[in-house]
Amino acid sequence: MLGLTPSGVSRAVARLEARVGVRLFDRSPRAVTLTEEGRRFHAQVTPLLAGLEEAALDAAGAAATVDGRLRVSVDPWFARMVLAPRLPDFTARYPGLVLDMTVSNHREEMMAGVDVAVRFGPPDVASLIARKLLETRVLTCAAPDYLARRGTPVAPQDLEGHEGVLFRNPQTGLPFGWEFHRGTERVTVAVAGRVVMDDPSVAVAACVAGQGVFQSFELGLGPWMASGQLVQVLPDWAEERYPLYAYHPSRHLPPAKVRAFLDFVQEVAAGA
C-alpha cells in the first residue's frame, strides 16, 4: 500500500525512533508490537495525520475548482484593448471566481502577489512558466492632418525630420528605439520627439490629435485605422513582430483557476 519494501519500512522506523529518542516497537521473530511509548506516540499523532490528510484533500479540491480569488497583472494595452471587452464572457463562465486585475508593463518582480502575469516581449525569466499567446506586428502611424502638415515619409530615414511620439521602455526608462523590418533588412532610425509616454493608449490619443508619428502594436489599433483617425505609414517596413506571453510561477500543475484564465486569454488572443 505504501510502496515500501520491508527493509525500507525498517529503515523508516529506525529513523523515526532516532528522531523522537525512544523505542517505539518491540521486535521478535514472531511479531512486531508497539511499546508503551509507541502507543502514546500513536495516539497523539493519529489526529494530526488525519488533519493533514483532510487539509490535503481540501487543498486538492480547491485546486480543482475554478472559484475563489485570482490575482493577475496584465499589460495595459492588452488589458484595455483586447481583454477588458471580453471579461463579461469570463465572469459568466466562472461565476464563483473573483478576478483581481492590475495593469502594468513592468517586468521586474511582475509575479509579486499575483498568480498570472501577461507581458509583451520575449521571455527572460527562466524560473517562470511562459505560454506564448500571440505575435503582433509593429506599425508606424500618424493622423491624416499631421501628414498633411509635415508630409508622408516614404523611407524610414525620412522620419529623422519628423516629430515622434516616443514610448518609454519600462526596464531602462529611456524611449524605445525605432526599428523597421523588411525581409532580411533591418533599419534603425533615431526619431526625435518632445513627448515621451509610458502608456500606449495615451500615446495613441496624442497621435490621433496630431502630435506626431507613433509606433504601436497592430493589435488593438483596428478601430482608429478603420475610422481613418490614424493612417499607417511605411507599410512596406512593417514586418517587425512582438510576442505576448502569459507567465505563472509553478512547474507543477497549476490550480484550475489559473488554467482557466490562461486558456481564456489564449482564446481571446487567438481572436484578436
Describe each region flagged by the PLM.
Residues 19-20, 41-63:
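Alpha-helical linker/hinge and terminal dimerization helices associated
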Residues 68-126:
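Central regulatory/effector-binding core of bacterial HTH transcription factors
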Residues 244-253:
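A bilobed periplasmic-binding-protein/Venus flytrap-type ligand-binding module shared by bacterial periplasmic
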Residues 16-17, 230:
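Conserved amphipathic alpha-helical core elements
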Residues 17-34:
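A short LG(V/I)-centered, amphipathic sequence patch enriched
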Residues 108-113, 123-244, 270-272:
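C-terminal regulatory
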Residues 217, 253-267, 272:
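Short amphipathic alpha-helical coupling segments at ligand-binding clamshell hinges
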Residues 3-8, 12:
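Helix-turn-helix DNA-binding motif, specifically the short coil turn and the N-cap/start of the second
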